[in-house]
């Protein structure tokens, strides 16, 4: 064990512990923007700097380890001034129009800036923008990127896809698709990990609310019968945004909220998930009868992100995938076929919406093969949990 002092409070931590982790163990708040434990510990944001007795310069706490007898100060005037300057520098290259930002109220940069209370004085802004294909389910806004490198590291070390990389040099350094490629050429699996770990709104899912909720959207114009399906994950996650208890945020209340929004019919995708299991199970048993005719093992095809990953990284194993559709697309096909017949409605006159936790679903619904009626997509629009709430 190593004995240290943090803000004059003596504590003991294991040898090799970073200063940041030691501070967190002692319940001392040290803000961070770029830090991800064991994934991104590069000290790029310089917001986690602390003062160490006997050392003139401030040090980053995320990638420096504790030493015996070290005395650390996390909130000295010198530290606070340095953090304010670093945040001001970051904001000088950041699009600060927060009211319309999808991450407003849930933005790490916004929180750190508010906590530091540095007033109105900022540096002259120099914001850069890059063109991006807005029809792609993953959207990158260069004007909001703070160069924390989280997306690069999470894609490299967790997903192993290496979609992102550092681009340009010097003061022009930024993050972009690796090898100068267009995102559509980068074999992105649309797993959403880079969006989840981005501390700001530089990365987000494509916003598809307009055709559903806008003044000219289907819920307001009532031009078609509107049907919505909800994924099991959304059923349990939607209440977090409203800080509702698990008991209060029941599936019945969710269905009621959707009906109040204007949807004519509400379905639970759990039903289609059961159909997927039955379909894949039956296919597996059929393959077992003729082992020599199939490539093994057999993989599920229920996740479009997984299917995209396999097709791009292991094309020789595509035949291992089940031929079954995902639950979303099975439910969409049921709505446009069986259900349309039950309510005596033309499939063309049904607007099918899916609320899912994954942006890969947005790409899946647009595949040309996902048209079981020949009248258009089985699922017209996919909304993620954030868009729904």
Residues covered by each model-derived region:
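Fe-S ferredoxin-like electron-transfer domains
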Residues: 46-190, 196, 200-225
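Short structural boundary motif marking the start of a folded domain
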Residues: 1-4
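Residue-level recognition of alpha-helix initiation/capping sites
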Residues: 14, 136, 146, 189, ...
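Short strand-turn-strand beta-turns centered on an Asx-Gly dipeptide
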Residues: 6-9, 53-54
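A short N-terminal beta-strand-loop micro-motif at the entrance of redox/enzyme domains
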Residues: 9-15
């Amino acid at each position: 064990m190593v004995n240290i002092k943090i803000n004059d409070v003596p504590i003991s931590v294991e040898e090799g512990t970073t200063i940041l982790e030691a501070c967190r163990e002692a319940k001392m708040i040290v803000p961070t923007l770029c830090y991800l434990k064991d994934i991104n510990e590069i000290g790029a944001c310089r917001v986690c700097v602390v003062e160490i007795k006997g050392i003139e310069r401030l040090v980053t706490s995320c990638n420096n380890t504790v030493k015996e007898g070290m005395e650390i100060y996390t909130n000295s005037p010198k530290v606070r001034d340095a953090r304010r300057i670093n945040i001001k520098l970051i904001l000088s290259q950041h699009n600060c129009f927060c009211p319309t930002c999808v991450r407003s109220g849930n933005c790490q940069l916004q929180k750190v800036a508010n906590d530091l209370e540095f007033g109105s004085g900022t540096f002259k802004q120099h914001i850069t923008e890059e063109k991006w294909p807005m029809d792609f389910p993953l959207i990158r806004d260069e004007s909001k990127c703070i160069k924390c490198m989280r997306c690069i590291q999470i894609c490299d070390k967790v997903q192993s896809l290496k979609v992102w990389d550092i681009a340009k040099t010097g003061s022009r350094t930024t993050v972009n698709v690796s090898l100068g490629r267009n995102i559509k050429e980068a074999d992105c699996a649309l797993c959403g990990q880079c969006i989840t770990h981005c501390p700001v709104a530089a990365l987000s899912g494509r916003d598809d609310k307009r055709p559903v909720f806008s003044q000219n959207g289907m819920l307001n114009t009532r031009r078609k019968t509107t049907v919505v399906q909800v994924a099991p994950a959304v059923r349990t996650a939607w209440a977090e945004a409203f800080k509702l208890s698990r008991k209060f945020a029941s599936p019945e209340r969710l269905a009621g909220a959707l009906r109040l929004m204007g949807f004519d019919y509400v379905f639970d995708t759990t039903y289609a998930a059961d159909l997927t299991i039955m379909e894949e199970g039956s296919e597996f048993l059929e393959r077992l009868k003729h082992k020599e005719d199939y490539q093994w093992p057999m993989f599920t095809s229920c996740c479009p992100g997984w299917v995209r990953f396999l097709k791009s990284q292991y094309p020789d194993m595509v035949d291992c995938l089940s031929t079954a559709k995902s639950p979303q697309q099975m439910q969409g096909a049921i709505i446009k076929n069986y259900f349309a017949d039950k309510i005596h409605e033309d499939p063309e006159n049904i607007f099918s919406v899916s609320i899912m936790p994954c942006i890969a679903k947005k790409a899946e619904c647009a595949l040309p093969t996902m048209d079981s009626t020949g009248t258009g997509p089985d699922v017209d629009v996919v909304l993620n949990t954030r868009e729904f709430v």
